[in-house]
Amino acid sequence: MSNTEKNLPTKYDHMSVEEGLYQWWLEGKYFEATGDEKKQPYTIVIPPPNVTGKLHLGHAWDTTLQDILTRTKRMQGYDVLWLPGMDHAGIATQAKVEGKLREEGISRYDLGREKFLEKAWEWKEEYASHIRQQWGKVGLGLDYSRERFTLDKGLSDAVNKVFVQLYEKGLIYRGEYIINWDPATRTALSDIEVIHKEVQGAFYHMNYPLTDGSGHIRLATTRPETMLGDTAVAVHPEDDRYKHLIGKTVTLPIVGREIPIIADEYVEKDFGTGVVKITPAHDPNDFEVGNRHDLPRILVMNEDGSMNEKAGKYNGMDRFECRKALVKDLQEAGVLVEIEPHMHSVGHSERSGAVVEPYLSTQWFVKMAPLAEKAIELQQKEEEKVTFVPDRFENTYLRWMENIHDWCISRQLWWGHRIPAWYHKETGEVYVGTEAPADIENWNQDNDVLDTWFSSALWPFSTLGWPNEDAADFKRYYSTDALVTGYDIIFFWVSRMIFQGLEFTGERPFKDVLIHGLVRDEQGRKMSKSLGNGIDPMDVIEKYGADAMRFFLSTGSAPGQDLRFSMEKVESTWNFINKIWNASRFVLMNMDDMKFEEIDLTGEKSVADKWILTRLNETIESVTRNMDKYEFGEAGRSLYNFIWDDFCDWYIEMAKLPLYGEDEAAKKTTRSILSYVLDQTMRLLHPFMPFVTEKIWQHLPHEGESITVAAWPTVREDLQDTEAAAEMHLLVDIIRSVRNIRAEVNTPMSKKVQMQIKAKDEAVLAQLTKNSSYIERFCNPSELTIQTDLQAPEKAMTAIVTGAELFLPLADLINLDEERARLEKELEKFDKEVERVQKKLSNQGFVAKAPAAVIEGERAKEQDYLEKREAVRQRLADLEK
């Protein structure tokens, strides 16, 4: 692709810059892991998006961070594998496919299981193609030769093997439990698929009569229809109000069933009346109480949310119709004494919107305690543990693991990994295996499929060839180096990958977990359909380009924090890229057909040359260090400041002096430095902005085919010159101060004015005299005087910089009162700085713990501020004369 044109197009057009580049990268196989044994492997597996539709901004953010990591590591010489893939997303995909069928007037039952699954696979192929297109638009450097899908044969084999082995170890069992039940889709839901909403409900206060006729006991419920399944009433064992009733019975209203009054510490004495109804088949807490007291479990609902025969005369009614009818009957019977309005949180199915029912069901479960124990123990081993970034999320993870419940893994769906369990048609015997029974005609396979998170938990190793532990990719690329994901799925996904990885590979599945937050709108609200504040990343790319979106997403927040999305800030990033483009055009137009081998940094350098090379070194160090710490925002800020301020605003302007001069050697050195600095900067920026950096780099004198595989910049000690950097800082301070003064008195830079500089000592005088051409070029003085023994002229505007004082005699333009006010403001600023640094230096803890270089730096600051403050005081005194 190498482009020999020296000029970039006049205007930056993100669409033309980004067009075709991704396909060119893919054709060059730059993203494919090589297996080169001379290189150290670096692996990331992409968190697989659901094959349910479009990727959102959260995906764009998450994958951009991974792309930054993998592009950086590839340039640093690693054998990088970034493995792509997608998740079948059980209930989410099935709901979409069923919705599409409903539009055609068909249900999945009309089609039957096999035909329905064919439709689901068609959906998968269509949407997988959309997702790949979106990945390409974002510019993700994925190794498509290794793309995986959670229902691939290899991954399905891994799922079956894990299920069977856990079953054989007694860690998978089948039993009754209260699960989240969606009556609309008729399946169990994981907690993450339940959305809690505040709804207006009521407390229904009822009197349950004591069977012996001695009175009644009052309680309240928000779900009166479940009382039909009550099997006890509970009070706290230490509640003096009810101690005498423990062991007695009440008669369940309407039903007439006699149920016991039991004592259990689950009851809160101070909440309500201190009495609760116990319905073990319809409430998870009641289920636990029922187990402790050996209570019967009476299920009064069907799977579709209608009442069953156990509900007596309400049999066949919808649960909410039953509630109305039952409340009316309770009122007429004098049992219901009060209906108290009550706002409370109610779980709704994320997919169907139906109110979720806590429901007693026979399901498959993973026994979590033994698995969690190993994962907790791992975190005590410093060299082997999973490192969370930020580290506060390790506590979140451990807290969940320490309080873990058994995991319901069966789902009443068709789309997914079918549970590898069969039931004998005659004996009811259960067979679990990776292969079907030999006499399959005598067995029925379990109809349920596994929770999507079950296969996702195996993702880091199943994608690399496990259970074949001799698979080349598994041996080379496992365990992986980093996982990038949101804090909202630490429990649902991260924790499960860790315990499954430990159980089946004996290793952590990843070394580091980089946690990011959620993308919110500018007001800090979560993006949602109901608020209408969602933004399609493809729309952002169309308007401003992938590079602008990526840079904003990756630098807009610190690790673990939420990101407030702002289209205005994306536009600002586009403006930044436009500035880079224009600066690159200037550099390329002044290359004079320079070839890569002609770049020579050994010639005599100006102070500006030495300074920009030193600043480049500092930027390389800062960006590399922050990338290693996952501080992409800090790395981005270092790059932004270097490119915008140092390179574009200062060095390019200063480079015009030799470029437009007569000294050919100086021209060659300047061209070499411009080319070198722009090349190195494009490499540093490439992981953030892959498209524009490739485009510019291809126009620069370069070696190699693509910037994607160009070497990552390293600090060059031979180009480091801290003295020159200090000289340049003084020049920049002087030029900035003069510009500020001119702006204050509305004197344009084109108007020549007298300028006097009082140097602090002979060394500063020598520096300023040597570099006076820069001062003359950028300050435009009619006359420049630099001395060590200058007296401040009357009615002069003043600026104090480190090592010098500036005087601009602007007698006709100066307002003495305004100048006095300005200097007093300066004095106040230096007073605060002196106070701050002296407070720091008087802190014994700081002095005892801080490195000597840091303390020395603070003392140097103190001296500098004291000198500047004294100079301001002197100028104020002069104004009073």
UniProtKB/Swiss-Prot annotation:
GO BP: any one term: valyl-tRNA aminoacylation
Annotated localization: Cytoplasm
Coiled coil: 810-881
Residues annotated for ATP binding in this entry: K529
Membrane-spanning intervals of the chain: none
Catalytic reaction(s) noted: tRNA(Val) + L-valine + ATP = L-valyl-tRNA(Val) + AMP + diphosphate
Motif, 'KMSKS' region: chain positions: 526-530
Keyword annotations: Aminoacyl-tRNA synthetase, ATP-binding, Coiled coil, Cytoplasm, Ligase, Nucleotide-binding, Protein biosynthesis
Primary subcellular site in the record, as a coarse category: cytoplasm
Any matching Pfam family: Anticodon_1
Superkingdom as given in the UniProt entry: Bacteria
Motif range ('HIGH' region): 49-59
Oligomer and partners: Monomer.
Domain notes: ValRS has two distinct active sites: one for aminoacylation and one for editing. The misactivated threonine is translocated from the active site to the editing site.
PANTHER family: VALINE--TRNA LIGASE, CHLOROPLASTIC_MITOCHONDRIAL 2, VALYL-TRNA SYNTHETASES
The name this protein goes by in its record: Valine--tRNA ligase
Organism: Bacillus thuringiensis subsp. konkukian (strain 97-27)
Gene: valS
